[in-house]
Amino acid sequence: MGGVSFLSTVPSFTNTTNHQHLTTLSSSSHRSAVIRCSKIEPQVSGESLAFHRRDVLKLAGTAVGMELIGNGFINNVGDAKAADLNQRRQRSEFQSKIKILLSTTIKAKPELVPSLLKLALNDAMTYDKATKSGGANGSIRFSSELSRAENEGLSDGLSLIEEVKKEIDSISKGGPISYADIIQLAGQSAVKFTYLASAIRKCGGNEEKGNLLYTAYGSAGQWGLFDRNFGRSDATEADPEGRVPQWGKATVQEMKDKFIAVGLGPRQLAVMSAFLGPDQAATEQLLATDPQVAPWVQKYQRSRETVSQTDYEVDLITAFTKLSCLGQQINFEAYTYPVERINLSKLKL
């Protein structure tokens, strides 16, 4: 039987039987990509090797089945991987919506950037390595913790986060976002805002050119691990007192001691200077009095004077990513939801 063609890619079945052959058409100018099943002369006397309709249907059915497997619709070997891909897509889409809303909200209230940075820092800095308690768990939302001296002036930043959370929760298909997650994501958006603001300043205040500069030379591609660590759980009560310094009153040694206690150090203290208070220049002036911190302060100041400020941005992202996960076991299935499955038994070929 001749003249049966498959325009889609079909796997080779030449080994399934010793009397079926696939031949490709050729011409004087080119070789066709169309695969054709052709009748050939029998090599064993008395044996008919013609393709029957059932053979063609078998090939077509196999091709459709393999395509369904490739697309994750078969409930067998690839099912777990398909589910994992669906969950990644759902989480990524949800996170993108949060980031867009945070970016828009922060752009309208840039004066809250220092508050958002310190909220992210202080929520995480309650981590105690010895007891493995505290950390980036959203406990700063409790009034008994927010009212502490080290958190003075952060209530407006938390109010902004509450507003965004309320809107995000109203559209979430996978449950409400945790305070732990949205506090750190707000910190991330605040950091990005400072990066973009710096690029705009370097372009003489031209927002369009600043956006182009940040897009071309910025560090957006360095946030991968931070974004993946999405699924923090919330504390059910305030963290213990006395774990976070009053950054505006602490000595450099006290600041170093706290950073070291959570697994960071002088380098991270220097690069995260913007998190310690609203006046980064004044903070860095103080930090530069310490011989261990001073070289790093100078390094990042030089970096911020460059067009791309790569060293500063990349090192800050690295330090912030580590800080944002203190005390957490990330739930990589958070914010996912079941999707409707295709019932293959109802499909007719």
From Swiss-Prot:
Disulfide bonds: none
Top EC category: oxidoreductase
Locations listed in the record: Plastid, Chloroplast thylakoid lumen
Classification via SUPFAM superfamilies: Heme-dependent peroxidases (SSF48113)
Enzyme Commission (EC) number: 1.-.-.-
GO terms assigned for molecular function: heme binding; peroxidase activity
Record bears the keyword Ligase: no
Any single GO BP term: cellular response to oxidative stress
In-chain residues carrying the UniProt-annotated modification Phosphoserine: S155
Pfam family, one: peroxidase
Keyword Thylakoid belongs to the record: yes
UniProt keyword annotations, A-Z: Chloroplast, Oxidoreductase, Phosphoprotein, Plastid, Thylakoid, Transit peptide
Protein family according to the UniProt entry: Belongs to the peroxidase family.
Protein name: Thylakoid lumenal 29 kDa protein, chloroplastic
UniProt source species: Arabidopsis thaliana
The organism's taxonomic lineage, starting at the top: Eukaryota, Viridiplantae, Streptophyta, Embryophyta, Tracheophyta
